[in-house]
Amino acid sequence: MASLQTQMISFYLIFLSILLTTIFFFKVNSTETTSFSITKFSPDQKNLIFQGDGYTTKGKLTLTKAVKSTVGRALYSTPIHIWDRDTGNVANFVTSFTFVIDAPSSYNVADGFTFFIAPVDTKPQTGGGYLGVFNSKEYDKTSQTVAVEFDTFYNAAWDPSNKERHIGIDVNSIKSVNTKSWNLQNGERANVVIAFNAATNVLTVTLTYPNSLEEENVTSYTLNEVVPLKDVVPEWVRIGFSATTGAEFAAHEVHSWSFHSELGGTSSSKQAADA
């Protein structure tokens, strides 16, 4: 009898060992993905959270109209697992979108537009030059926010001294860690691709104007920066857009948006095509 009990205990120990090894194997070798593609925004876009003046109409996402002093934001409704606390792994991701900034005058445009990554409970922040994403030009680690800005209005307290409109990468501050001068083509559709390589921590931004009639001007821009996402943002985040106006203004619209992330060492998948 004792021998049988010993055999049973040994069997269960072996079984438990195999089970735990299998779970660990799949945990380490599986990949968690999040994907969605919005080619046309519906009036009742259920996978978006609107904040401030953001809304959808006529197949597009409108963040602000061309009126003074507005803040509009839109977030993807499902939180994104951007890094894993257990494994330390960080997700690779790529997002692409098309947007239009349309102002009554191409000389008086404000304030700009951002794609951002922020805590799940993120709320609209200060408007105007802070673009609805930040509250300070000083580095604030409690912000836990990374943004790519398309800045149309010069703010002397933090913008590049050349006073040019620019694309910027922001980490916990409205003062960009890297910028690229940008020639806004008022009313023209811009295509943007933002990619993050977890192996190198490099965030790459590319903007092109595919239908530009301004042959003498630059119509393609690329910006890179090392951003240690795991050290900046929470494990779970929301992604979205924000735009603001001030004394000067413009309409800020998004016409399409797709996103795909892959996080190794986890075990779930979320996908929504043309959501």
From Swiss-Prot:
Pfam families: Lectin_legB (PF00139)
Binding locations of Mn(2+): E149, D151, D159, H166
Positions with a binding annotation for Ca(2+): D151, F153, N155, D159
UniProt entry keywords in alphabetical sequence: Calcium, Lectin, Manganese, Mannose-binding, Metal-binding, Signal
Signal peptide start-end: 1-30
Site (Cleavage): P210, N211, N217, V218
Post-translational modification: The mature form consists of two chains, alpha and beta, produced by cleavage of the immature protein. These remain cleaved, yet fold together to form one subunit.
Source organism superkingdom: Eukaryota
Residues involved in D-glucose binding: D111, G129, G246, A247
Similarity comment: family membership: Belongs to the leguminous lectin family.
Quaternary organization: Heterotetramer of two alpha and two beta chains.
Function per UniProt: D-mannose specific lectin.
Additional comment: Binds two manganese (or other transition metal) ions and two calcium ions per heterotetramer. The metal ions are essential for the saccharide-binding activity.
Protein's name in the database: Lectin
Organism for this UniProt entry: Lens culinaris subsp. culinaris (Cultivated lentil)
